[in-house]
Amino acid sequence: MKNIGVNINSCKDPDGTIRKYVEKVIKEEKKDVQVKFYDELNYFDEVCKTKPDFFIAFGGDGTILNAARNLVSCGIPIFSVNIGHLGFLSSIEFKDFKDAIHKIFKGEYFFQERTMLKCSFIKGNSKKVFYSLNEVVLYKGNMAKILKYNIDVDDKFYMGFKSDGIIISTPTGSTAYNLSAGGPIIYPNLDLISLTPICPQGPYAGTIVLDGKSNITISGIDANENVFITVDGRQPVDVKGVSFIEISKLNYKCKLLKLKDYNYFEVLRKKIILRTEECEGDKY
């Protein structure tokens, strides 16, 4: 490990205190390592060009999701440090950073690959493509009105739905909106995709878990309806008038760097199942 890229959520480090500490810790552990700090805006192309051995993202889950979407095609491993609220996706908490860097330079780490989704559709004369580590959500925005749509899997009709929307989730995203909507927790290493309708009508319209190779098509949406998608909880994208929305596994996988003593079930239990207060971070 000779070259390390770093991005710190500037909202969490307005005076640069964390940045100074991070550089100090890394240099104390290994003097000849090159540490490159990247600003918030438009840094991803530069990261892909410089190709650091791994990339450290300091922030909450949003920071990690953003890094994953933008760095996945470069194959650069991401080591995530929580300085946000919950930080379920983080490899470590900020207080453990010094010990973590020591372990990394001793080789006490492994790489974990996570499935990502590709969402695409044609609107007007242009094709829109989005990447997701957590989920793609189709919904009606702020309208309290039911949404009607059809789901095809691998060009075979699955079901027509009446619901408030639908969540198409990766295993990584299964503990996010999917779980809140009644979907299952899926172990993050598995190559699966889950479909969870939001408040559906019908005798059974629960989650279906599909093979990761499945191609999902959403169609049959009224062209006059105001309908949106969100990808990993980002700004909504208007899909009014779109005939088909296609969702499938991305050809690349997100590569995460984890310490050898990382315990997924401990993090799951504390931060998702029990939601203990010490994992809550700052109060709302």
UniProtKB/Swiss-Prot annotation:
Gene Ontology process terms (BP): NAD metabolic process; NADP biosynthetic process
Active site: D61 (proton acceptor)
Catalytic activity, as annotated: NAD(+) + ATP = ADP + NADP(+) + H(+)
Localization, UniProt: Cytoplasm
Gene Ontology MF terms: ATP binding; metal ion binding; NAD binding; NAD+ kinase activity
Pfam families: NAD_kinase (PF01513), NAD_kinase_C (PF20143)
Any one GO CC term of the record: cytoplasm
Matching InterPro entries: ATP-NAD_kinase_N, ATP-NAD_kinase_PpnK-typ_C, NAD/diacylglycerol_kinase_sf, NADK
EC number(s) given by UniProt: 2.7.1.23
Gene3D superfamilies in the cross-refs: Probable inorganic polyphosphate/atp-NAD kinase, domain 1 (3.40.50.10330), Probable inorganic polyphosphate/atp-NAD kinase, domain 2 (2.60.200.30)
Keyword terms, alphabetized: ATP-binding, Cytoplasm, Kinase, NAD, NADP, Nucleotide-binding, Transferase
Residues reported in the UniProt entry to bind NAD(+): D61, G62, N134, E135, K145, K162, D164, T175, A176, Y177, N178, L179, S180
HAMAP family, per the entry: NAD_kinase
Stated role: Involved in the regulation of the intracellular balance of NAD and NADP, and is a key enzyme in the biosynthesis of NADP. Catalyzes specifically the phosphorylation on 2'-hydroxyl of the adenosine moiety of NAD to yield NADP.
Protein name: NAD kinase
Gene name linked to the record: nadK
